[in-house]
Amino acid sequence: MESGNVVNVQSELSGIIDGSKSYMYEQLWKLCAGPLCDIPKLGEKVYYFPQGHIELVEASTREELNELQPNCDLPSKLQCRVIAIHLKVENNSDETYVEITLMPDTTQVVIPTENENQFRPIVNSFTKVLTASDTSAQGEFSVPCKHAIECLPPLDMSQPIPAQELIAIDLHGNQWRFKHSYRVPRGDTTGWNAFTTSKKLVVGDVIVFARGETGELRVGIR
């Protein structure tokens, strides 16, 4: 419904805003994207540069996109509002990217914005730069004691060899099983080699673990 040049797009957005991803997915995605990744918020005003977009597409596809050149004279920049944000990951890798849907801000648009005061579950996480021993075929992934205590489920230290199975979910929704045991140092052994082989991890890659309040464990790479 339109009134006085004010448009409420709540109903249209209900099918556009990506609510299929969990809060843990969002947090892991941001950790994998890294601290330099800055994403606008839902409802924010941004500028869209048509010519710059075309040039980026040409550079990524290595093809000239003359058919995309507009027949009319577009301004160098268009003021828009962010109406949808989708945090995604490449199918054949763990490279993160974001799809942002914009609406030209030609009217005063009422768009649902993020509630900064809403409850946010606590998520503990840690990152580690992989070493040669972490990525070797005979190696294991050693977790610093501080990170293991903060981010991993507690071990039963009354056992002769405290150990447990961890199930962690990556950004693709795949489950990975690791054996977490207390030794010197603590290590994730069984299942780790399968993970490093599948992800093609090398020295210098960064692994990310995140655990929510409910105990849900997530794993990713940067």
UniProtKB/Swiss-Prot annotation:
PROSITE patterns from the UniProt entry: B3
Entry keyword annotation includes rRNA processing: no
Keywords: Auxin signaling pathway, DNA-binding, Nucleus, Transcription, Transcription regulation
Feature: DNA-binding region: 126-222
Any GO molecular function: DNA binding
Superkingdom of the source species: Eukaryota
GO biological process terms held by the UniProt record: auxin-activated signaling pathway; regulation of DNA-templated transcription
Pfam families registered for this protein in UniProt: B3 (PF02362)
Any one Gene Ontology cellular component term annotated for this protein: nucleus
Record family assignment: Belongs to the ARF family.
Protein name, entry field: Putative auxin response factor 23
Annotated organism of origin: Arabidopsis thaliana (Mouse-ear cress)
